Amino acid sequence: MKSLANLAAAVCGMLFFGVLAGPAFAQSVPTSYSWTSTGPLISPKSDSTHNIIAVKDPSAVFFNGRWVIYASDVNSAGNYNMEYLNVAADFSDAATAKPYFMDNTPGFSGYHTAPQVFFFAPQKKWYLIFQSGQPQFSTNSDPTKPQNWTQPKNFYASQPSSVSNWIDFWVICDTVKCYLFFNGDNGNFYRASTPIGNFPNGFNTPVIVASSSQFNMFEGDNVYSVEGTGVYIANIECLGPNGQRYFRTLWASNLGGTWSSLGNTDNFPTPFLGQDNVTFNSGVSAWTTSFSSGGLLIDGNDQTDSVNLSHLKFLYQGSNPAAYAKGPYNFIPWQLGLATLKSSH
């Protein structure tokens, strides 16, 4: 998340704790994707006390016929917080959606960013997951009432010794456990778990489940169950040879198992989502060459983070290429766009 925009890295090969997908897997989940994209749908909006220059890291769930979106925002001083937006099902009013700034909610002043929102069905509560130095959570009975989120709490008493750096936290559960995934901005992809009945308490010591070169497994992870396949996918943000952001994908047959590369999506020319497999809708200029922190629109809104391959959509952050190259990172004017799957095989 907080990296120099003009980082240039020759992306090199990866080391995984697993093997590439075999024939049985290839029949259930595609390994090659192409997308179409909108222009910017959501741009930074300010008020009398918030001079916002970027909106980023969106997490969206469908609730009461509309999209509930929590996102990071960045002010003119380069400081991070979060905001809430409520958007029509077809995003037709996204451009005019008025943000609620989360630092107006008690306990949310200062650095809180990179949200994930979901309904935790076993407790009939909504959870907001985010980072504030530590991974934190808050609960609510109604995600459309951002002023009612509880005081943030830490998942851990302190940073575990097994972790050198942690960023971009994501929770997903199966029927037995809840898992906390995150990146390290260092090429490592981490996992911790707790019995589903203990959530949000009792997460064990995180372990590394996949590794690569720093910029080939960087940050911005999001993890999903793929409907009808028995497969899980993890999308992780990478940097291309000129610093462009794109997503690669890992897969696993269970959340606690081995994670392996999905086809050739680990390469900049053949990503899960990136400049080489996205075309913009008719009349829309190529407004970004970076497809950065965001996530797929899930089916439903609960802790299983389920997606359907027949209608994938990815809400991402992008930026004018010249502004992105100029940087520094905390002052890039990110906006939100929506990519829709065009084809896959």
Question: Where is each model-derived feature located?
Answer:
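Conserved glycosyltransferase catalytic-site signature
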Residues: 290
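Sec/Tat signal peptide C-region and signal peptidase I cleavage site
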Residues: 20-26
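Active-site pocket scaffolds in enzymes
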Residues: 293
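Bacterial N-terminal signal peptides
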Residues: 9-19
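Beta-rich carbohydrate-recognition and catalytic domains
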Residues: 27-220, 225-286, 300-345
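Positively charged n-region of N-terminal signal peptides that target proteins for export
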Residues: 1-6
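Short, basic/low-complexity N-terminal boundary segments at the transition from targeting/disordered tails
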Residues: 13, 22, 34-36
